[in-house]
Amino acid sequence: MKLEHQVANYDLCRELKALEVKQESIFYWAQPAEPGSDWTLTQDSEIGHFSAFTVGELGEMTKGLDGEAPTYSDHSWWWHKGSTLVAEKTEADARAARLIHYIKKMLPNNNVEKK
């Protein structure tokens, strides 16, 4: 399995950093050397700009959250966003999106559904 499928995608990880999630992980998203290239994964925290959390790391962070853990069905990872069922491409993405939703729900003056 490719490493990109075992960590949360760039956008979700960037949002986790913006939400001030502690940036400690095995892998990091690093800015490309050449402009216009895709961000790459590295284990070097010195050149990494923000954490690329693995399924296991996200599993530890989401342990004990309300609701069920993401489940796999019909080629997608599904999780509950309030009363809505949401699909993600990978388990890491589903766990990251669930954590983002939970953090936003806990923020004061949020607009996230509280169910």
Label for each model-derived stretch:
Residues M1-K115:
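Glycine-rich anion-binding surface patch
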